[in-house]
Regions:
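Glycine-rich, mobile lid/loop segments that gate access to catalytic sites or pores
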Residues: 174, 178-269
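Hydrophobic alpha-helical hairpins/lids featuring a short glycine-rich hinge
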Residues: 149-192
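Hydrophobic alpha-helical transmembrane segments of integral membrane proteins
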Residues: 33, 83-84, 157, 161, ...
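Terminal-appendage/accessory-domain detector
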Residues: 30-155, 254-271, 278-509
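Well-ordered alpha-helical segments within folded domains of soluble proteins
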Residues: 159-167, 216-223, 270-275, 336
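Well-ordered alpha-helical scaffold segments within catalytic/enzyme domains
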Residues: 97-98, 166-173, 221-228, 276-280, ...
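N-terminal secretory signal peptides
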Residues: 1-30, 55
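Short connector loops/turns at beta-strand edges and beta->alpha or beta->beta junctions
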Residues: 142, 161-163, 168, 244-248, ...
Length: 509
């Protein structure tokens, strides 16, 4: 097994030598470039710059690709294994519940009209499609709303891109349960690390490129490539094709129906990740190291990237164990404010009619994402109003768009002010919220939330995760099938072929 730490030590020891060699090579290439250009101009011939086409893989890529190739044979530590099962169940529930929402319905219309022929399952439906199209549809359904998991440091939604890609590859190529779970965990590790290398949450906030889609294409490719049993060289080529397809712009913030957002966050990346894996599995080759050398990925997207983060604590730090599961099925920046209102209500119960004013403080970058949005589940003012009225924020309430025009809800919403608090920027990437409530009798109540329920600093229990999944699954699958799916996920290592689970993903009618 290649240890990331050992690789980094070797890199450090060889650093000066590598820099010296690189400088000498660049000097020689520049000298040849000038001489060739002068000769061509003297002869009256056109001149094209000379490029170094064949460039070997660097040490980080070598370690990363070796780790990726061996992941299927390496057992997960007990804690990572448990977390991987939590996130698998949570994402399956997100996909299946998302099948009945607007973006999910849009994905199914596409499959019916244009989806390729194939046997890959479109969850929550009786539809099947090609693995590429199934990954697209399941990815869109996974992020059809704000139910799926999120990784705070990278500002991404790993499960929604990784799990659909893994499912599609497993449907196409076959895979047992233990291998499947390890492939999913690998997807989290690779996709998240690419974004962390690019700058993590700072890249997410400062760039017009969508970190979410970048995570999904690399994470989806890693999971699918593991299921395809690609060797280290093939893994490097696959990452090349993932990079070539990497795209997405934060213009998704202007999306009013969550359809484009679902495509950018998950559907596109899952589709493209599976494509990258299947291209190489079918015999394609590619560039050995897309992360270094001429015109590399980081040069194009994040020139200040820290490549060493690609393999930082790889095999020691499992990103699936550092990913949050949402207690509330709403946009991530709304989680802490809802926790704050919930905590205040538990300590000092009151009715909505007693409230005079509510001030919610968020860091400006977080506030901008959820400020008076058109969709209920990503509109902070609306969801806080719902919490005041209902004393909770259910899945149904978070997706009840007509309620945004309800007079009683609008009356409470008018009491709510979102404060862009620069002081909270200093605490990022931790999303801290301050909720101040003033009652009509002058009583002032306040709560500062620094660790949202479901985050790694305040994790949900297995029972809470099961309860959330059950609430999402039962309306579509029925209680019996939902219970069997939950039970199967927590003993997935006993499943001989993931394809046998298809009936558990589909409604009875």
């Amino acid at each position: 097994m290649v240890r990331a730490g050992d690789t980094l030590k070797r890199d450090s020891l060889k650093g000066d030598t590598l820099k010296g060699d690189t400088l000498r090579q660049e000097t020689a290439m520049n000298r040849r470039h000038v001489l060739n250009m002068a000769a061509a101009m003297a002869a009256g011939l056109p001149f094209w710059p000379v490029r170094a086409f064949a460039q070997p893989a660097g040490p980080a890529m070598t370690a990363l690709s070796a780790y990726m190739s061996s992941a299927a044979r390496r057992a997960l530590p007990a804690e990572a294994d448990e977390h991987a099962k939590h996130h698998l169940l949570d994402t399956l529930a997100s996909i299946i519940s998302g099948s009945e929402l607007g973006p999910g319905q849009a994905a199914q219309r596409y499959i019916r009209a244009h989806g390729g022929q194939g046997s890959a399952t479109v969850l929550g439906t009786k539809l099947t499609a090609s693995p590429v199209d199934a990954a697209l549809a399941n990815g869109v359904m996974a992020h059809a709303d704000e139910t799926d998991d999120s990784h705070n440091a990278s500002r991404t939604h790993p499960g929604a891109g990784v799990v659909p890609a893994a499912l599609a590859a497993a449907d196409q190529l076959g895979c047992d349960g233990a291998h499947f779970l390890r492939a999913v965990a690998l997807g989290y590790d690779v996709g998240v690390r690419v974004v962390l290398a690019m700058g993590g949450y700072e890249f997410s906030y400062d760039s017009s490129h969508a970190a979410h889609s970048i995570m999904s294409v690399f994470g989806g490719a890693a999971a699918a490539g593991s299921i395809a049993k690609l060797d280290p060289k093939q893994m490097r080529w696959m990452l090349d094709y993932a990079a070539q397809q990497s795209s997405g712009l934060v213009a998704w913030r202007r999306d009013k129906d969550h359809i484009e957002k679902a495509f950018v966050f998950a559907g596109m990346g899952a589709r493209d990740g599976v494509t990258a894996a299947l291209l190489v599995h079918s015999g394609w080759n590619g560039v050995d190291d897309i992360f270094t050398g001429d015109d590399n990925f980081f040069q194009a997207y994040a020139p200040k990237a820290q490549r060493e983060k690609l393999i930082e604590k790889l095999g020691e730090r499992y990103e699936v164990a550092l990913t949050d599961i949402k207690k509330w099925t709403v946009g991530s920046p709304i989680q802490a404010p809802l926790d704050g209102v919930d905590l205040i209500l538990r300590k000092h119960p009151f009715e909505a009619a007693q409230v005079r004013r509510v001030d919610v403080h968020l860091a400006p970058a977080s506030a901008a994402v959820v400020d008076n949005r058109d969709m209920p589940d990503i509109c902070l003012q609306h969801m806080v109003a719902v919490m005041l009225l209902d004393k909770t924020a259910s899945f149904h309430a978070a997706h009840d768009k007509p309620r945004m025009l309800d007079p009683a809800t609008l009356r409470e919403r008018a009491k709510i002010t979102l404060v862009y608090d620069e002081e909270l920027t200093k605490l990022l990437p931790v999303r801290v919220a301050i909720v101040n409530i003033e009652l009509a009798d002058g009583t002032r109540l306040s709560e500062r939330v620094t660790a949202v329920r479901g985050t790694i600093r305040n994790p949900m229990s297995r029972q809470e995760i099961v309860d959330k999944a059950r609430d999402l699954l039962v309306p579509i699958l029925g209680r019996d099938k939902a219970e069997r799916l939950i039970e199967t996920v927590y003993k997935i290592e006993t499943v001989a072929d993931i394809r046998t689970l298809r009936p558990l993903f589909q409604p009875e009618h």
